[in-house]
Amino acid sequence: MVSDFGLPTFISATELLLASAVFCLVFWVAGASKPRVPKGLKRLPGPWGWPLLGHVLTLGKNPHVALARLSRRYGDVFQIRLGSTPVVVLSGLDTIKQALVRQGDDFKGRPDLYSFSFVTKGQSMIFGSDSGPVWAARRRLAQNALNSFSVASDPASSSSCYLEEHVSQEAENLISKFQELMAAVGHFDPYRYVVMSVANVICAMCFGRRYDHDDQELLSLVNLNDEFGKVAASGSPADFFLILRYLPNPALDTFKDLNERFYSFTQERVKEHCRSFEKGHIRDITDSLIKHYRVDRLDENANVQVSDEKTVGIVLDLFGAGFDTVTTAISWSLMYLVTKPRIQRKIQEELDAVVGRARRPRFSDRPQLPYLEAVIMETFRHTSFLPFTIPHSTTRDTSLGGFYIPKGRCVFVNQWQNNHDPELWGDPEAFRPERFLTPSGAVDKALTEKVLLFGLGKRKCIGETIGRLEVFLFLATLLQQVEFSVSPGTTVDMTPIYGLTMKHARCEHFQAKLRFEA
């Protein structure tokens, strides 16, 4: 029977027993899926999530902002679910440092995400789930090779090191390109040319060659990177929803294809180097890695062989990480400088006083250019264009802040929240470079260390030092010689677009005027 409202007035005993059984089963499964919390520790707090979906809808278009908002309610350590996968979210500088630095061995893992298996054919040092001796040896090897062809000195050059030589050359070429564009059309989009110049720096270090800006091979590579960023920005639901791996998935297919093309490009460069390798003439990072497994054979610290495939993986990791971050930092900096001309003029006054106009900036000028350094740091902080680190995972049962976290738990580190924490910055929404200067005008080192962009601890980006140097020298060289502006009446859109790295909307109305004749 049904009531006047269309609702049942009673149910049978069989229906009642069946409903009770289903409820008990669901309750039992939910309880059984929760790990047993050791005595003295607490269960992770977190919001209620939708069945099957978890908190996917809660994250919205800006997950970094949504999770920062949740941290205000649940604290610096809480848990959400993506599908049926539990994810621990870390916020707050002290908590993040405790996890990644002081308890670094507990949190140095990577989750075994489905999409990660397609990066470098599963051989990625950055995305791979391995965190043991093999991974540590490869990381040391990559770090040594990177240092050899970046911060190490080049005896045949007047520059202090290979990196300085490459960046100075590319910055000069970039200025020439801007002049050509101004003469031809009177405005330009700086991003498309900055990315080519930065890509050339990492090409020179990894492959020993540079490309012209209209070279189709380099253009193809840069376009691949742009496509990769767009696809990665949408996330990979198949990482958390198993069924999506077996259904038609155009975004995942595109992601696989892009990774295949990146791998093929790098593999071909490595093969070329293998064919022309001479152990007495090490030309670049790729040669350095080939020498390691052909001549040195074993890593002296861990006795780990490095194969051809591993070499391709290391080079691809270094190459991929080597230009997107730097390009994004320079591009955002230029956007701030055209919208805040007072800051641009102040940097140029500092450059005129310290470097002058008779020579080009050097890495050695960096300590004497504190205001430029402060602007770079504020750009890193304000944009937080790397809102999260690559996800971590726990390598063993552990605890943080009194909360129990089991082995294998996926961990998100919200760098954006730290960089916009009012308790840390006071006025986080304001773009104010002076916050990074002491009363005497020096860089406040203690405060700069509170900005999170490159991660911390055992998974910290191995290219951080080089990336910071590149951003500094590109900007110093450009701003010494060029005054940037936008066409009159142009509205510059500074809204961050969420992604693997958060970009701004492209602006095609930049203008550049030489400050003096070379």
Swiss-Prot record:
It comes from the Eukaryota. GO terms for molecular function: arachidonate monooxygenase activity; estrogen 16-alpha-hydroxylase activity; estrogen 2-hydroxylase activity; heme binding; Hsp70 protein binding; Hsp90 protein binding; hydroperoxy icosatetraenoate dehydratase activity; iron ion binding. Substrate binds at F228. It is a peripheral membrane protein. Its cofactor is heme. It catalyses: an organic molecule + reduced [NADPH--hemoprotein reductase] + O2 = an alcohol + oxidized [NADPH--hemoprotein reductase] + H2O + H(+); estrone + reduced [NADPH--hemoprotein reductase] + O2 = 2-hydroxyestrone + oxidized [NADPH--hemoprotein reductase] + H2O + H(+); estrone + reduced [NADPH--hemoprotein reductase] + O2 = 4-hydroxyestrone + oxidized [NADPH--hemoprotein reductase] + H2O + H(+); estrone + reduced [NADPH--hemoprotein reductase] + O2 = 6alpha-hydroxyestrone + oxidized [NADPH--hemoprotein reductase] + H2O + H(+). GO terms for biological process: amine metabolic process; estrogen metabolic process; hormone biosynthetic process; hydrogen peroxide biosynthetic process; lipid hydroxylation; long-chain fatty acid metabolic process; phenol-containing compound metabolic process; progesterone metabolic process. Keywords: Cytoplasm, Endoplasmic reticulum, Glycoprotein, Heme, Iron, Lipid biosynthesis, Lipid metabolism, Lyase, Membrane, Metal-binding, Microsome, Mitochondrion, Mitochondrion inner membrane, Monooxygenase, Oxidoreductase, Steroid biosynthesis. Heme binds at C461. It is found in: Endoplasmic reticulum membrane; Mitochondrion inner membrane; Microsome membrane; Cytoplasm. Belongs to the cytochrome P450 family. Interacts with cytosolic chaperones HSP70 and HSP90; this interaction is required for initial targeting to mitochondria. Interacts (via mitochondrial targeting signal) with TOMM40 (via N-terminus); this interaction is required for translocation across the mitochondrial outer membrane. This is Cytochrome P450 1A1. The gene is CYP1A1.
